[in-house]
Amino acid sequence: ADLPVIWIEATEEAKALQATLPVFVALKQAGLARSSRIAAIGGGVVQDIATFVASLYMRGIAWSYVPTTFLGMADSCLGGKSSINVGPYKNLIGNFHPPSRIDILPVFARTLPAVELAGGAAEAAKIAFCRGASAFAAYERLAAPVLSGEWKEQQLAELLHATLRVKQWFIETDEFDQAERRLLNFGHTWGHALESATA
């Protein structure tokens, strides 16, 4: 059967609250019901929009996610947070609505420029660092081949698995970002301010 497809341009403008409204209309016009499921394939912008829309469409429907960026694979795919921009304010609103299924395909990382791999590796380093010396030592060992540029998909998969296990600990300890999990937000406020100032 033909499945309806909604294409979303992965830009900060697409994450604006007003820009998400046509997505709700498109889902309705495509005939999605409460029992339907959204399958999101893409990076962080697509994930933010899919999380937000799936959480609100008909008061919430299931969704699954296939991250295509290293940052999405190593971090944001797990946790179920959405972040939506309002006016000049980045990530002002959002909610929690985790995907019911996540499929990580390391082959997508082969399509990414080195700067994208470095960005994902930096976030993975921060996650490991926040957990402690043992987790960070494991990160250093597993990340070395990826950072060298000479890596096999199995090596990337091992790094992703270790990173997501650490993040899972934070989520299970503090699902809604009230205590320990807030450590993972380290650097985000400054980073978002810098992005806004240089946009």
Over which residues does each language-model region extend?
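Short glycine-rich anion-binding loops that position phosphate/pyrophosphate groups of nucleotides
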Residues: 1, 43-46
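Short glycine/serine/threonine-rich phosphate/pyrophosphate-binding segments
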Residues: 45-52, 73-74, 192-193
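Short hydrophobic "helix-edge" motifs at membrane interfaces and signal-peptide entry regions
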Residues: 6-7, 57, 94-96, 171, ...
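A glycine/threonine-rich phosphate-anchoring loop and its flanking beta-alpha core
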Residues: 52-145
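Non-catalytic interfacial helical region
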Residues: 24-41, 50-65
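Glycine-rich beta-strand-to-loop/alpha-helix junction loops that act as flexible
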Residues: 10-11, 41-43, 186-187
